Amino acid sequence: VVSMFSNAYTDVLVDTWSTGFDQADVEDVQVAGDDTKLYTNLVFSVAEATTQPIDASQMTAFHMDIWTPDPTAAPAVFKIKLVDFGPDGDFNTGTSEHEITLDDTTTPAMATGAWVSLDIPLSEFTGLTGRTNLAQLIISGDPNTVYVDNVYFYAEGGGGLTEPDVAAPTPTVPEADVISLFSDAYTDVLVDRWSTDWDNTEF
């Protein structure tokens, strides 16, 4: 994973989440204790990583979670653009980019009042011929209020990891309704052993 913004990972350097020339207001808020970006008055917003451009050459997909209270039925659209500045880091030379448009008919579909997880193969950004010097993430569209979380690039198929790098999700079922064998979230019943002498595994 190469993370731009997520409590689940260590983020790379992002110089700004809203440049002086874009048309949006952005603030850091918490939703149920989780850090989240809140965009209001959104026309288009530019996040820039120009000090240390992002190398996503080994990644295969882009992820973003979004939530909006605004209408998402046609003709509303939400757009995501990735821009690579090239080896010289100059916007005016060697730049490649591509924009993806999402609406209420795409997969996944835009929705109102619900988190939508976007997992977009980088191969769909067909105009993005370079991925080693990604310097801009641009979002735009008709939803003018958008919550954004978990913005990262990742390698599908596990990306070569041999063990998890984040904990399993915390259970949400009330303890009164649970009999737990093993969980930090509940009081466990007695389990004599997790691997018997006659099984065939290492523990």
What are these regions (language model features)?
Residues 1-203:
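Beta-rich carbohydrate-recognition modules and glycan-binding surfaces
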